[in-house]
Amino acid sequence: MSFAAYKMMHWPTGVENCASGYITHSLSDSTLQIPIVSVHDDIEAEWPNPKRGIGPLPNVVITAANILEVYIVRAQEEGNTQELRNPKLAKRGGVMDGVYGVSLELVCHYRLHGNVESIAVLPMGGGNSSKGRDSIILTFRDAKISVLEFDDSIHSLRMTSMHCFEGPDWLHLKRGRESFPRGPLVKVDPQGRCGGVLVYGLQMIILKTSQVGSGLVGDDDAFSSGGTVSARVESSYIINLRDLEMKHVKDFVFLHGYIEPVIVILQEEEHTWAGRVSWKHHTCVLSALSINSTLKQHPVIWSAINLPHDAYKLLAVPSPIGGVLVLCANTIHYHSQSASCALALNNYASSADSSQELPASNFSVELDAAHGTWISNDVALLSTKSGELLLLTLIYDGRAVQRLDLSKSKASVLASDITSVGNSLFFLGSRLGDSLLVQFSCRSGPAASLPGLRDEDEDIEGEGHQAKRLRMTSDTFQDTIGNEELSLFGSTPNNSDSAQKSFSFAVRDSLVNVGPVKDFAYGLRINADANATGVSKQSNYELVCCSGHGKNGALCVLRQSIRPEMITEVELPGCKGIWTVYHKSSRGHNADSSKMAADEDEYHAYLIISLEARTMVLETADLLTEVTESVDYYVQGRTIAAGNLFGRRRVIQVFEHGARILDGSFMNQELSFGASNSESNSGSESSTVSSVSIADPYVLLRMTDDSIRLLVGDPSTCTVSISSPSVLEGSKRKISACTLYHDKGPEPWLRKASTDAWLSSGVGEAVDSVDGGPQDQGDIYCVVCYESGALEIFDVPSFNCVFSVDKFASGRRHLSDMPIHELEYELNKNSEDNTSSKEIKNTRVVELAMQRWSGHHTRPFLFAVLADGTILCYHAYLFDGVDSTKAENSLSSENPAALNSSGSSKLRNLKFLRIPLDTSTREGTSDGVASQRITMFKNISGHQGFFLSGSRPGWCMLFRERLRFHSQLCDGSIAAFTVLHNVNCNHGFIYVTAQGVLKICQLPSASIYDNYWPVQKIPLKATPHQVTYYAEKNLYPLIVSYPVSKPLNQVLSSLVDQEAGQQLDNHNMSSDDLQRTYTVEEFEIQILEPERSGGPWETKAKIPMQTSEHALTVRVVTLLNASTGENETLLAVGTAYVQGEDVAARGRVLLFSFGKNGDNSQNVVTEVYSRELKGAISAVASIQGHLLISSGPKIILHKWNGTELNGVAFFDAPPLYVVSMNVVKSFILLGDVHKSIYFLSWKEQGSQLSLLAKDFESLDCFATEFLIDGSTLSLAVSDEQKNIQVFYYAPKMIESWKGLKLLSRAEFHVGAHVSKFLRLQMVSSGADKINRFALLFGTLDGSFGCIAPLDEVTFRRLQSLQKKLVDAVPHVAGLNPLAFRQFRSSGKARRSGPDSIVDCELLCHYEMLPLEEQLELAHQIGTTRYSILKDLVDLSVGTSFL
């Protein structure tokens, strides 16, 4: 491998930081919401009595490594008729405070070129009446700060200021140091007057905010963002804390309730540690500085000394109490200017002078590494390192806190951050488990009315109840254990002098997390297809990952593509299309919610299959039975489309020359299209139906001569008439694609886009349907795209143009309404000769679709498929801009004709934002008729979205207003797709492959699809460490550990070496101390077998380890039995005894054989060999039938004779501890914990294990693997600084020191700890048959990516493009992608390696550029757009491993 590409395939999911604030709306927007009056409510009725609701809800902002996401919190209140109509919305958590569901909805998602170190929300201030919005402050290493605000006009975040304190000008801030233990830490003043960022250990950067009305925020700015103003940073300056005689700053926070901003800083005067505590213990100090940002003065106004050395976090107490809480490992302290108090948490707590006794809590707890937030002004919620939730109550009189009171609540996930969301919710962000949104309710009074503390198994968790909830969309899931498990109750202990508060909790939503990935195995799926080849074969496999920690530990089964569960299949050659239709002979006359529920569960009646020259009709009752001969459907030729009209009372079937309206199997009406001279063959051929779009009661037909016909249905008579829209008839412009969009519901969404539309369309008129009940028909629009690339939206049936945009096909980032001049058609015609006409022709839109899925807050999506296979995806949003009206007025004065047709109801406020779809699908259409590729679905196993057919088909599903794309590669190309709901296939689907096989399937119910890849979580309730795969019996052996409480004397006796005759020295311990329990980790090997039904996996065997023995490695190895001459597949386990520091290290190697199929199922594995060795056995591997073991600092090669291992060779160089060992043929690669990598070879002739070369630098390795590119062998290694390096062995090159030194081939900063590499063969594209392997890797952030070899021509092309994209694309938060990818060496001097890896995270921006910019960039680097896109698609296809 000389050149490679770095490609992310699954982005980080472990949440590190979270915050809440009013980012997309202001506090006044939330508090002044006018209740929506439903059409069923009486307008004259009085306003309902106010009841305790959930209050105004801010946004939730989360970061996971380099991912930034902003969510809006949606609450469904009881009695909201629109919500209750949908029976699927049975929310988790039950009803609390009048709210029966709360969910997170994505506003924006960004992949940054840098890892977010800390995050804060800068408040606008100004109380409840403030119309201002908050801003987000992000910090990045080493000292970069970005301030972002939400801009309504582009529906995205935009940067308002950047502050960088790096480079030569700021070198003095580092004071000679090169590395710092943590990145910048940001905190903000609660009133939004300033912010503070701690960088380089002791430099405090003060960010002064601009006050509203000052010069910086001008009137123009306010208008351009829709009249809203966000908090902004005006200037910054630095306070050097060293000048204030501070030495080791641990944390800082801004206090509430001061006229000027006040910072309290927690610092340690002199370092101490556990071994010195008896001599130096209370070493921490608090200092409160009053910040005057105008005069740049910061006097100390109060301070506190003698805080414990293990103090680590500050929490500012809200008004009216004020002051600060100091969290320590064994105590909690409260300090303010006038008062202080403390609380001891366990027996290790001590006061500074040891004379006075600290008040103690009712139970013992360790509070190191806790996170906290406030759920009321006097109650803090603390999340401990074990996942327990504690409630800390401040008991106060006036503003003086008298004492602290700690009570236990329930246990939850192990949190990495926690934030309050409004006054009724909090968000627990987790790197080790799913992140949770929890609602709480506080009641004053006795806690007796509450069920009180429950048992341990009824905690609030994000996992453990997956099986059932996954059948529904992520925001409508339910739980197997029900609401009981999700509530957790806690109360303060009964004390007479405090008003007692009791809290109840309910989990409302969760974000799935697959991190941290410690290890993974690559195994066959249960439903694998043994005959698959090429890309289809890849989808036979799945990744089984060790993720999570402690009680959040789980196996995550990841699959990059979906493999449906097949019910049945039949051969059906020559199929062109399939449709399912409903039919009810009699329709009820009540259009209430029960009818809607019935509609949801109504079975399909007929399946219509279009073949080459005929049509088949099947009845979809209990069995699929063909009824082609006995129905009035048109069966003599192929069908173009079929669907339901008139509320499912009729079926329309459209074929090339006509259409039929059917009531069940009987025809009511037949229409014929085509030329007026139907006798002449050529005439009728000239105009046949090309594509069809149905929106009850209209049917839109596009003919082969590019004309448009509209079939208008009459619901009273259930008949249809043909009309030709005059607007389109008279136009010379050729139409390339068109579709109908039904804007359904009681509040059609697009009506909000027009200021006058409320008057013109009448608000919520109750239209009496034919069925007799009020029916909300909504509005219907026709979306048309022309050959020139322009797009127009017309209302139906009057065909007034309500929205138009030119150059739609070029894929601009934002679309807004701009009238198209008639000249535009002529201009485009002339310009086609000048530009590369082939590229322009290929960007013709061949298919359009517009859809708004069900949900109270959903917005429409607009999809377009271009002739070159590009898929454009736009999400609609509203922006009432002042500028848009100005622009419209000026245009109408220039060209009155452009606006006169539309009247006054143009969709002025409608805008579209282009969003990326993570698809690698790109297939050009031939010049013939493009088949329809997009099929919408509203309920397939509870999911909604669309299916994309073609050569690389896939599913696009909607979760939280976010589209998730999952490919389906198992059947190759798919020709047709439709939904099917009947007795045997509940909410399933049918598709036909290009090979002519019709399959009836369902979606696998066990997978969670609201993730970058479909994932199934198998809870272990223990920490998984390593996993391997035994292919023959499809078993997964893995190492797990779980905490066990043991008496202290047992633990101490296990720490001494019994064989050496050592005695336990416990004379200084009392008998009470020895009876106390101590928690230790116990290890075992579990052997799991996947369940066929997708349910929980079965544990086939457990192999416990001995006391204080840790299992370090488990691998399936193939050894040659020297006695029989046969190969044996064995399970090898390496362990280490973790004992006292005086005991010599030792470990065991264990070999197990797998039972034969005929054996008793009890004996899945049998121990065949066990041996104790000096040193820890940290890695094992098999090489040419021998077993390679790393035992402490030795590498020993063993021969197996069936009963014992015999050492035949060893390597005794100075590796300290081998973390990774890989074998290819006779070559061995070792990764050491500190001494970088070693490259060895094994020669069987002389039984030699010899060192070929090594890296002479020191490097803390995490994972290693061989990278194979044809005949070239390279060595890849990941390290503790989040880099990846690729080395090669070149003994003939002079700089390799006669071959002893490995040379650098590439280096790259990943930005995450890579914990495991896996070498997988790439799918070769076309004629290129080079044997190439890519490295798939997993990280501790929950992300997956790969390093894939490239040939030089491709690399040079992509590298040139990458350099151009650095400047051509605006980067979120102003981060430089090249700087992010530079190798990090933590200040160590080193020679930089070659730049031979391209970054696909930057290259993927190319596809999102408008066509003109894509062509210009390609021209600048001397290539074509086609070549660049082909390279990117080939790379995606080649690395579709799962």
UniProtKB/Swiss-Prot annotation:
Keywords on record: mRNA processing, Nucleus, RNA-binding
Domain of life of the organism encoding this protein: Eukaryota
A GO term from the CC aspect: nucleus
This protein's record includes keyword Nucleus: yes
Short name of one Pfam family: Beta-prop_RSE1_2nd
MF terms in GO: RNA binding
Keyword RNA-binding: yes
One BP annotation, GO: mRNA processing
Localization annotation: Nucleus
Record function comment: CPSF plays a key role in pre-mRNA 3'-end formation, recognizing the AAUAAA signal sequence and interacting with poly(A)polymerase and other factors to bring about cleavage and poly(A) addition. This subunit is involved in the RNA recognition step of the polyadenylation reaction.
Subunit structure: Component of the CPSF complex, at least composed of CPSF160, CPSF100, CPSF73-I, CPSF73-II, CPSF30, FY and FIPS5. Forms a complex with cleavage and polyadenylation specificity factor (CPSF) subunits FY, CPSF30, CPSF73-I, CPSF 73-II and CPSF100.
Family in the record: Belongs to the CPSF1 family.
Name used for this protein in its record: Cleavage and polyadenylation specificity factor subunit 1
Organism of derivation: Arabidopsis thaliana (Mouse-ear cress)
